[in-house]
Each structure stands twice: as C-alpha cells, then as structure tokens.
A protein has these predicted regions:
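ATP-binding glycine-rich phosphate-binding loop
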Residues: 24-45
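A conserved alpha-helical element in kinase catalytic cores
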Residues: 54-94, 107-123
Length: 266
C-alpha cells in the first residue's frame, strides 16, 4: 500500500529475473524506486531518457485489464504514465512493463489534494459501467464472498472479517466505477496543474468513495455521508487487502481501525 513502512519488498538485484528486459533494446536498469511493496519497480534509462520498469505479479488477464483502462483514461484526460512498448510492439513481457518517467512532487497541502480530488472525479465518471477486473471483487460482493483480488476475508479471524464487513456497509450507495485503490502521497505526482496517478496495481471496480477514504481530513470530497464512516471503510479495506500480502502493515491498519472506531463511533 502507500505506507512506506508496510509490505514486503523484493530486493532482487538488477541482474536477477530481468531477462525479459531484452525486448526493449538499450534499456538499462539503474536503481530501485521507493514503494514497490508488491511489485518490483526500477528506475532505468535508454539513450539518456529516464524510464520506469515494473514487474507485475498480476495474471495476464488482470494486467491487460489495467493497461486497457489506462489507455481509456489517457484518452479522457486522466494523467497516467505512458507505456513504452517492446521493440516488436508488445505492451508487456511476462508481467514486465516499461513506462515513461513522470516528473513531479508528492502532494504538499490542501490545494494539491483538491486537484487530486478533481482528477479522481474524472476517473470515476469516465469508468462508470466498466467491467470488473478479472479475479477481483467489489466491497459489496465481499459482504458475502470470502475472497477477491488480494482480499482474503476467509483467511481472517471471524471477528476481524465481521468488523471489516461492518465498516464497508455504510459506503455501499452510489455508482460502480473504477477506483484507483491505493490513493496516497507516494502514488500521486503534482507538476504544475498536472496530477498524475501512479501504480494502478490495486485498481478495481467498486463504489468511488474508497478513493477518498484516507485523504487528509481538511480536504473536501464528494462523499455525501459521515467522514468518520468513510475513513473506517478505507482502513478496513487496507486491512483486508493486505492481510496475506503485507501482514505487518495489515495488523497496523487493523489497530488503527479499532482506535478510530473507539474515538469516532464509526
């Protein structure tokens, strides 16, 4: 997720598991980039031009869904890193992708976050009715189902699964659309008026409110209900989606959810 302390980072050396990079002639790996808790992300260059190389753990169908989505969004004005195809025109090779390096800084205050909210609204409007990502499930489906995407409610203690589902219930109203799924400072770059959303690995179809759940409290969002309930839903989602993949982070988020509910009554 977006917490720099969470998750398991693959510290593979640049020479290990990168043979597929030969499909992009002249691309040289430089160093790991921050984040990459579930996927390895490297800074690279070709002929002096900076690039980003990522290895995705998603299935081919789930990765193709992500890349189709990003093409659709760029056509509608949502800034996202531009994919660099292989020399023979493929979008990825066994989960390895190359994209342009996006300049910018992370959001620094309410004005930046308001621009992020505006960009998210464009994303949600542009994807109403979009098909669900293969293998994933929306929070509404997971009120009954045990798993979907990275969520493994069936692997949690029953009391934790009940807590998570109860936190999701108040946010189920509204349209279904694509949500980025991991909106936080490290996944947003601001460059003047341009706001770029990075790392769409956790994108899915759900109610739009999850993308606003963990934004700073002082930032106004389109969510029409109680802000404490929205934050509880976001903390519950992070607990559920990280339970298996990032267990230390998930349990930290669970503790935060308990504290939040005690203090707010949400």
């Amino acid at each position: 997720m977006t917490d720099d302390e969470g998750g398991n980072v693959d510290d593979s050396a640049p020479g290990e598991g990168w043979s597929g990079l030969a499909a992009w002639a002249g691309v040289e790996l430089l160093r790991p980039l921050p984040g990459g808790h579930r996927n390895v992300v490297m800074l690279a260059e070709r002929a002096g031009v900076p690039l980003v190389v990522r290895r995705s753990i998603r299935s081919r169908a789930a990765l193709d869904w992500e890349l189709d989505l990003l093409e659709h969004l760029r056509d509608r004005g949502v800034a996202a890193p531009e994919l660099v195809p292989t020399d023979d025109g493929r979008r990825h090779v066994d989960g390895m992708l190359v994209s342009e390096f996006v300049p910018g800084r992370h959001p620094a205050g309410p004005a930046d976050w308001r621009r992020v909210v505006d960009q998210l609204a464009v994303l949600h409007t542009a994807t109403t009715g979009w098909p669900q990502r293969p293998g994933f499930a929306a929070s509404g489906m997971l009120l009954d189902a045990g798993r979907g995407g990275d969520v493994r409610l069936d692997a949690m203690p029953a009391s934790v699964a009940r807590l998570v589902r109860s936190a999701w219930l108040p946010v189920q109203q509204g349209p279904r659309c694509v949500v980025h799924g991991d909106v936080g400072p490290t996944n947003v770059l601001v460059d003047g008026a341009r706001v770029t959303l990075l790392d769409w690995d956790e994108a899915r179809v759900d109610v739009p409110w999850f993308d606003y759940a963990l934004l700073p409290d002082e930032v106004t969002t389109p969510w029409p209900g109680d802000r404490a309930q929205l934050r509880a839903a976001g903390l519950a989602w992070e607990t559920a989606t990280c339970w298996r993949a990032e267990p230390v982070y998930a349990r930290r988020r669970l503790a935060e959810l308990h504290r939040h509910r005690r203090h707010s009554g949400a």
